[in-house]
Amino acid sequence: MAQQRRGGNRRRRKVDFIAANHIEYIDYKDTDLLKRFISERGKILPRRVSGTSAKNQRRLTIAIKRARIMGLLPFVTED
């Protein structure tokens, strides 16, 4: 009998960008950092896509929402 290989489709674990770069405070004025976690349509990327921890995702969400209210980031992008 021929042997079959198992496994194969192993996905690489996503790394928390904020923790990896030792960012302690997520500033709402740092739009370059915040844009990494926003989709092309202007939506906040979920944890399963961005790889952030739950704590950093909450901080990120608050910072993005503040930046939107202050006019630094758009609520939605136009096509």
From Swiss-Prot:
Would you tell me the protein name for this molecule?
Answer: Small ribosomal subunit protein bS18
Q: Which organism is it from?
A: Latilactobacillus sakei subsp. sakei (strain 23K) (Lactobacillus sakei subsp. sakei)
Described function: Binds as a heterodimer with protein bS6 to the central domain of the 16S rRNA, where it helps stabilize the platform of the 30S subunit.
Q: Which GO terms describe its molecular function?
A: small ribosomal subunit rRNA binding; structural constituent of ribosome
Q: Which GO terms describe its cellular component?
A: cytosolic small ribosomal subunit
Which one GO biological process term can you cite for this protein? translation
InterPro entries linked: Ribosomal_bS18 (IPR001648), Ribosomal_bS18_CS (IPR018275), Ribosomal_bS18_sf (IPR036870)
- Give the family this protein belongs to, as stated in its UniProt record: Belongs to the bacterial ribosomal protein bS18 family.
